[in-house]
Regions:
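Rossmann-fold NAD(P) dinucleotide-binding segment
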Residues: 68-81, 85-129
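NAD(P)+-binding Rossmann beta1-loop-alpha1 motif at the extreme N-terminus of oxidoreductases
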Residues: 4-81, 103, 139
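NAD(P)-dependent dehydrogenase/reductase Rossmann-like domain
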Residues: 9, 285-308
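Rossmann-fold dinucleotide-binding core
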Residues: 21, 111-189
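Active-site-proximal catalytic alpha-helix in oxidoreductases
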Residues: 144-152, 173, 178-209, 219-232, ...
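Interdomain hinge/lid region at the active-site interface
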Residues: 182, 191, 228-289
Length: 308
């Protein structure tokens, strides 16, 4: 039948109240999105290189296949939620070669613009479409469907996939040209990086002054100085509990490096971002890579001579 009709049917076919979506990368973010989509009535076909992640997804009702090629044959709309540009580009190349008809790949990882464009080129060479759709939110927010999707690329596909975005998040923005969403994500992450260290600095000042950590959280969250980041991270700081991580410091450091390079390339000064970067680096040097990014609080406590 007509290709456009077939694509429309995948979103609201008679058998599927919601349609079919493929997900490559079933880790903290991908696994949570898959679970929410299954709950929302989507048929989710997934793959992850890690056997544990595959098994967890299978338990959540995801149909697990044995690789990106098999996934590309099974569905034409595919999410990539992967830890590196290399993994995303390799998956895009496999999908491009294996997909029997026009595929739409939603690149939802936070990657450099160079990597995002490499993904798009790999797909375009075989007549497929890439959408640049990074997410705003942590792993915990992914679980509670509290994500915001920044979407950019081919407009008609973004509009067609609106139900998908609202099946895994609470809101989405169509930001126009491919790559714009990643630029916006860098702007958002710059603020998250600064707010997280600022939250820790405030907690440490309060604790050093003898205030109760839980009380600092409660009072500051009710006032003008609060932020979404403070509300998510300060409770972890108060409890001095940084595992399991909803955003690992080691992965966050990669995101930080990408933003730093992006700002430098534009010749844009980022004095507060640069200052906060040093605190994250100190955390990694102390071996806190596997811990949540809120662990910058432990670094500042150490510097302040606070023992808990």
């Amino acid at each position: 039948g007509d290709e456009e009709t077939r694509m429309a049917d995948t979103v609201s076919g008679p058998d599927q109240p919601q349609g079919t979506i493929g997900i490559i990368g079933l880790g903290i973010m991908g696994g949570a999105m898959a679970a929410n989509l299954v709950r929302g009535g989507w048929r989710v076909i997934g793959y992850d290189i890690d056997a544990t992640a595959r098994e967890a997804a299978r338990h959540r009702g995801v149909e697990v296949v044995d690789g990106p090629a098999a996934l590309a044959v099974a569905t034409s709309d595919i999410i990539l939620s992967l830890p590196s540009g290399e993994a995303a580009i390799a998956s895009a190349e496999t999908i491009a070669a294996a997909a029997p008809s026009r595929a739409v790949v939603l690149e939802m990882s936070t990657l450099s613009l160079e990597d995002k464009h490499a993904v798009a080129r790999a797909l375009a060479s075989h007549g497929h479409i890439a959408l640049d759709c990074p997410l705003s939110g942590t792993g915990a927010q992914a679980q509670s469907k509290d994500l915001v999707v920044y979407a950019s690329g081919h407009g008609p596909d973004i509009e067609r996939l609106a139900p998908l975005f609202l099946g895994l998040g609470r809101r989405y923005f169509n930001l126009g040209d491919y790559g714009n969403a990643t630029k916006m994500k860098f702007v958002a992450n710059l603020l998250v990086a600064i707010h997280n260290v600022a939250s820790a600095e405030a907690m440490v000042l309060g604790m050093k002054a003898g205030l109760a950590p839980q009380q600092i959280v409660e009072v500051i969250a009710a006032g003008a100085g609060t932020s979404r980041v403070f509300e998510l991270r300060a409770p972890l700081m108060a409890e001095n509990r940084y595992e399991p991580a909803s955003m690992r410091s080691s992965i966050w450091q990669k995101d930080m490096a990408v933003i730093g390079a992006f700002a430098a390339q534009l010749g844009c000064p980022t004095p507060l971002f640069s200052a906060s970067d040093a605190i994250y680096r100190a955390g990694l040097a102390r071996g806190l890579g596997a811990q949540d990014t809120a662990s910058v609080c432990a670094v500042l406590e150490d510097m302040a001579g606070i023992r808990r």
